[in-house]
C-alpha cells in the first residue's frame, strides 16, 4: 500500500517536472532581422504521459540574443541563417508583456512560448576558438575576412593578399604584391 502511494507521488512529481522547460539546443528555421525574432525548432523529443516520444514543435516569435549594451549603442551583429544552432532558454515570465513594456505577466513559467534564442551554440567547436585562446584575442570572422584584436596586435584581413596589421609599433598594409610598412 505504501509503495503504491510513494510511486504515485513520484509519478505526480515527474509529470509536473515534465512540463518545466529550462533550456534545450535548437535550430533556426527562419529569422526576421527587422524584429530580431526567429522561428526555432528545439532538438530532441519529449515523452507524453502515455510514454510516446514526440518531437518538440517549432516555436515562433523567439527573441534572438546578440551581444549588446542596454543602450544598444554598442553591439555585435551577424547574419542568422536557417540551420544555425542556438540555445533556447525558457523564461520564468511571459516575454510578450515584457517586450511591449507592459506589466501583465501570466503564469507561464518555463513555457515553450517564452523562449529566448542564444546564438552560437553548435554541435562542433569553431576552430577559431583555439586561436583566440592561444593569442588571448577577440577574433571576428566572416568567411575569408577577419578582424583580430589582442594586447599586442590588430589585424584586419580580407584574404591572404589584402590585410592591415598593427604590431610592435609598426603598421603593415598589403594589397596584392604591394606592401607598405610604416614605423
Task: Explain the meaning of each model-derived region.
Residues 1-163:
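Hydrophobic packing positions characteristic
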Residues 152-183:
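Intrinsic low-complexity, repeat-rich intrinsically disordered segments enriched
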